[in-house]
Amino acid sequence: MKGFGSKVIRSLPNGARLICADNTGAKELEIIAVKGYKGVARRLPAGGVGSLVFVSVKKGTPEMRKQVLPAIIIRQKKEYRRPDGSRVKFEDNAAVIVTPEGSPKGSEIKGPVAKEAAERWAGVSRLAKIIH
């Protein structure tokens, strides 16, 4: 895991629903915790592109449902700014399920992956077909 080159807005709080963009059998995920979040009293922990979050599988195969797993956010709808001044946003919020070490559990990632997530997580960039 590496540090960020740009400031990504953390726009996905606890309770946010994400699409699972890999082939692990999960379809919909709900964020239940954000690893490394240090916040203010009564403020919901939130994650953004490249964040490691813990999710509960809400929809998917019977073996995957109701499990709590680590995941990495690879896309978010809320736009964020890159150091060159460009702004980036995607059409959905998506994550990929990973092992505790940070390597993806699935063997493919559907759709584009944000450059910030690919730079930070080497395992995710290996499986990504499109890095945007």
From Swiss-Prot:
Family matches, as InterPro entries: Ribosomal_uL14, Ribosomal_uL14_arc, Ribosomal_uL14_CS, Ribosomal_uL14_sf
Matches recorded under Pfam families: Ribosomal_L14 (PF00238)
Gene Ontology CC, one term: cytosolic large ribosomal subunit
Keywords: Ribonucleoprotein, Ribosomal protein, RNA-binding, rRNA-binding
GO molecular function: large ribosomal subunit rRNA binding; structural constituent of ribosome
GO biological process, one term: translation
Keyword Ribonucleoprotein: yes
UniProt xrefs under SMART domains: Ribosomal_L14
Keyword Ribonucleoprotein: yes
Family statement drawn from the similarity comment of this UniProt entry: Belongs to the universal ribosomal protein uL14 family.
HAMAP family: Ribosomal_uL14 (MF_01367)
Role of this protein: Binds to 23S rRNA. Forms part of two intersubunit bridges in the 70S ribosome.
Name this polypeptide is given: Large ribosomal subunit protein uL14
Source species: Methanococcus aeolicus (strain ATCC BAA-1280 / DSM 17508 / OCM 812 / Nankai-3)
